[in-house]
Structure formats: structure tokens, C-alpha cells
């Protein structure tokens, strides 16, 4: 009896001893589900509930085999990242997932490579090591269950050992330093404006005091002049009265 494709699909079994086996279709679904959340998080690390959503997306599209767990999905992504590093070092890659992963993690890899080279130039005592190879086959990887705590930063593309989480931390640190410098500059600018405004107010107060003193002085002078004029008028009237009295006598 001839076996139809439908019969083959129904009778398909996982490779012996490989409960974590991934097909290309399941891997493609995993990359899309993970990539959407990865980009939405500004290319940051996914949280546990994010990984559960990724696993649900994979299982809903490929539920024929054993359901994938969030840990298996994370380990698979770690393996894909290692494979991407290996393919990235080649002059030309024919790997079917290379373009998609290059779009997702390529920008982060470029920033990390620049940081690694700069660190190597500043620290010549770093021990050079070769990039870790993960083999040419993705479907037959044996490291999926051994990488629970392994991140994509265990080795740099330039052959120098890099601390875990270095890429994201370097980016976050540089952004944090830039924001701190900006905040300090704004604070200094505000303090300068405050000092200028304080001096301006002090000058206005001093000018108002001087204006009031001048006005007071002018008022006193006016009062004195009026009093002197009044006194002169009184003297003139008194002199006329005396003159008139002398004539009568």
C-alpha cells in the first residue's frame, strides 16, 4: 500500500531520544513569536511570561508533537543565536534563518563587537579564544537542555571572552550615562538661570531703594523751598506793615 503525505504526517515520530526536537516550521514560528516581543522590548531580554506566550504560540501552530515549554523555547533561541554567530563569520551564509536573525540581533551584535574591540585595545592582557562552534545542523543540536542559564553573550565574534549580558548592559550603561550627563547639564543650566534671576531681583531692589531715597530727598528739598518762600513772603508783608505804620506816625 502506498503511503500518502497525509499518512506520513500522521505517522511521523520524533527522533529516538530527542523530545526537544525542532522542525524548521516550528523553528520559524518560534523566531517570529520571539522576534515580535524582542523588538517590542527594544531588543531586551524577555520575561518569563513572555516566554510562556512564545511557547503557546509555537504549540498552537504545531501541536502534533509534544508541547514545547518556555524553557525549551529559550534554549532553542540561545542555540539559534550561537548558530547565527557562526554563520555571520562566514563570507556567505545559506542558512534559511540567517536573514531574519540578522534583522533581529544584527544591530545588537554590531554594538557589542565595537565594545569588545575597544575593550581589547584598552586591555591587552585579555586571553584570546576562538568562537564557540555549535555544529552545522540545527535539528540535531544536543545542547538545548543544557543551556537553561546560558545567554547569547558567552563569546564575542572577535575572539575575546566577554562577560554574560555584556551587550545589553553596555547599551543600557551608555544610555544611562548619557541621560545622567544630560540631567546634570540641565541642572547646571537651571542653577545658572536661578543665580542670574537672583542677581536681577537684587539689582531691582537696590534700584528701587535708590529711587525712593532720591524721591524722598527731592520731596525734602521741595518742602524746604516752600517753607523758605513762605518765610520770605511773611518777612515782606511784615516790612510793608512797618513801613505803613511809620508813615502814619
From Swiss-Prot:
The keyword Nucleus is assigned to this record: yes
Keywords in alphabetical order: Chromatin regulator, Coiled coil, DNA-binding, Ethylene signaling pathway, Nucleus, Transcription, Transcription regulation
GO terms, molecular function: chromatin binding; DNA binding; DNA-binding transcription factor activity; histone binding
Function: Transcription regulator. Associates with chromatin regions that are associated with ethylene-responses in absence and in presence of ethylene. In the presence of ethylene, promotes histone acetylation in an EIN2- and EIN3-dependent manner, mainly on H3K14 and H3K23, thus regulating positively ethylene-responsive genes.
Protein name: Trihelix transcription factor ENAP1
Claim: Transcription regulation is one of the keywords in the record: yes
Coiled-coil annotated spans: 193-224
Gene deletion effect: Abnormal general transcriptome profiling. Reduced ethylene sensitivity.
GO CC annotation, single: nucleus
Gene: ENAP1
Segments crossing the lipid bilayer: none
The protein's assembly and partners: Interacts with RBL. Interacts with the Agrobacterium tumefaciens virulence protein F (VirF) in the nucleus. Binds to EIN2 and EIN3 C-terminal regions in the presence of ethylene to facilitate their association with histone. Binds to histones in chromatin specific regions associated with ethylene regulated loci. Binds to the promoter region of genes influenced by ethylene. Interacts with SRT1 and SRT2; this interaction is enhanced in the presence of ethylene.
Signal peptide: none
DNA-binding region(s), residue ranges: 22-109
Region (Disordered): 121-157
Domain of life of the native organism: Eukaryota
Alphabetical list of PANTHER family matching this protein: TRIHELIX TRANSCRIPTION FACTOR ASIL2 (PTHR31307), TRIHELIX TRANSCRIPTION FACTOR ENAP1-RELATED (PTHR31307:SF40)
Biased composition (Acidic residues): 138-156
